[in-house]
């Protein structure tokens, strides 16, 4: 439901771009795609990702995020093996890689101090994060069992242009512009690290080309913020009243704080985030102001 072909307008005429609509769980279709195209890299962004929806409808998260990932793994393994007829073959075509895009939510919650590092055990607390943790473990198992070439990245909260308006920042911007209530869970003091989408993309590109086979890399923006502080910043920037804020009952199992240690990717692969939150949120708010038609199409459902 969150997919929008308008987001691909800039690249739709690129000869390297091909859009195929299908269900990630459809083994026959996925195999067909691998058969038709010379695919040497899979970057698996495909996922149900909204925690609230996972609480209401966990099954679709489990089947999409877990089974869907396994379907992709099986197809890639089959088409990338040097000897497809040898089920024990652990040799793959040169340059192939499966890059699983995951989330810091798989680690669970932190107290007032500390940060997530890649060696921490996975302790997910929502159906969404549990489904992503499960997918991560399956990807890892394919590497350990079949010698399959993989990397896993775990990022903090993303923000920036083109984000579906069920997410915190675009939701608050859109509601502010319409003078609608701004729903804030609990006391609003849940803390998240925020990563601009451009920084996330550059990190993924870095891991794709430099990542050590089998390794996990945390991707963080070094921008810890409480939810309520972000809401108030958006209100101030748009010149609205804090009376729009409505504190609502907290989400079940709501993690209090996430913080991500990105030392591994910065020291070993040479990546670092470019955006400060102050710069990124200013540009993001301006993008939504400049693209009201885009967000109206989303909210109205006309984009479907």
Locate the predicted segments by residue.
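Activation loop
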Residues: 4-7, 103, 112, 168, ...
């Amino acid at each position: 439901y969150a997919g929008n072909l308008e987001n691909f307008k800039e690249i739709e005429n690129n000869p390297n771009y091909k859009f195929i609509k299908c269900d990630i769980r459809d083994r026959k279709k996925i195999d067909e795609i691998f058969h038709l195209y010379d695919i040497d890299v899979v970057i698996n962004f495909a996922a149900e990702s909204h925690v609230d929806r996972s609480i209401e409808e966990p099954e679709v998260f489990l089947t999409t995020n877990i089974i869907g990932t396994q379907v992709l793994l099986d197809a890639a393994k089959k088409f990338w093996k040097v000897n497809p007829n040898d089920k024990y073959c652990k040799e793959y075509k040169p340059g192939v890689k499966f890059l699983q895009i995951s989330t810091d939510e798989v680690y669970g919650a932190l107290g007032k101090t500390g940060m997530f590092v890649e060696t921490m055990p996975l302790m997910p607390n929502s159906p969404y994060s549990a489904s992503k943790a499960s997918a991560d473990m399956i990807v890892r198992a394919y590497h350990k069992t079949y010698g399959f070439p993989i990397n896993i990245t775990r990022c903090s909260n993303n923000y920036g242009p083109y984000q579906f308006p069920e997410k915190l920042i675009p939701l608050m911007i859109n509601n502010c512009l319409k003078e609608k209530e701004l729903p804030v869970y609990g006391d609003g003091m849940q803390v998240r690290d925020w990563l601009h989408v451009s920084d996330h993309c550059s990190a993924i590109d870095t891991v794709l080309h430099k990542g050590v086979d089998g390794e996990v890399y945390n991707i963080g923006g070094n921008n810890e913020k409480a939810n309520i502080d972000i809401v108030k910043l958006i209100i101030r920037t748009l010149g609205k009243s804090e009376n729009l804020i409505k504190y609502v009952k907290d989400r079940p199992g709501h993690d209090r704080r996430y913080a991500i240690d990105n030392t591994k990717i910065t020291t070993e692969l040479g990546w670092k985030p470019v955006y400060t939150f102050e710069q990124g949120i200013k540009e993001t708010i301006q993008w939504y102001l400049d693209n009201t038609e885009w967000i109206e199409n989303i909210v109205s459902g006309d984009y479907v």
